[in-house]
Amino acid sequence: TSWATQIGYTQPQYSVSAIVNQKYNDWSDSYFSTSLGKERTYNDADSTNIGLRAWWRPQETGTATPSISVGFDTSETDATSNSNTTMYFVGLNWQDMFQADDRIGLAFGQPQKREGETTDPFAWEAYYQFQVNDSVSVTPAVFGGSDRNGTAGSDITGAVLETTFKF
């Protein structure tokens, strides 16, 4: 059994929202990003989960001021000690910096981490999207993370090139 309540307020230049979710007996979440998270699956405990989100964007694009997105989640369960989790993210996006419709973005954050973890997982990405013409955009990006899945030394880096066609 589960219920959720969400509230939000949005204006053209900003938005804030919050969600509260309560799960009761026999709930399960099959994915957690840290190794100790596996102990939280398939239990008969109750869980209270809170998510907070906000974004803001400048009135004019093409300036050094980015749009900003932030988020924070927390989850508390009465199943076991140290079973609470937290995560956060921050995203920055600059639009129209070099030419119309281009975007530069940075994002970083902590994947869901359980209390008592001895590692501090961290993830990041950076990209630049540019319009080749009205129908084609190209986005090179790099990304990385440290202590992936809560495992010390399990670091990753990579790159991707995305091409989008609009018809």
Q: What are the roles of these predicted feature ranges?
A:
Residues 58, 71, 82-97, 103-108:
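Extended oligomerization regions of viral-like shell subunits
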Residues 24-30, 60, 74-82, 98-100, ...:
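Gram-negative outer-membrane beta-barrel proteins
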Residues 3-5, 9-18, 24-29, 59-68, ...:
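Repeated loop/turn-to-beta-strand initiation elements of outer-membrane beta-barrel proteins
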Residues 155-167:
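Outer-membrane beta-barrel "beta-signal"
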Residues 93-137:
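C-terminal hydrophobic structural anchor segments
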Residues 18-22, 68-74, 90, 104-110, ...:
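Transmembrane beta-barrel strands of outer-membrane/channel proteins
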Residues 5-7, 52-54, 90-92, 126, ...:
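Membrane-embedded beta-strands of outer-membrane beta-barrel proteins
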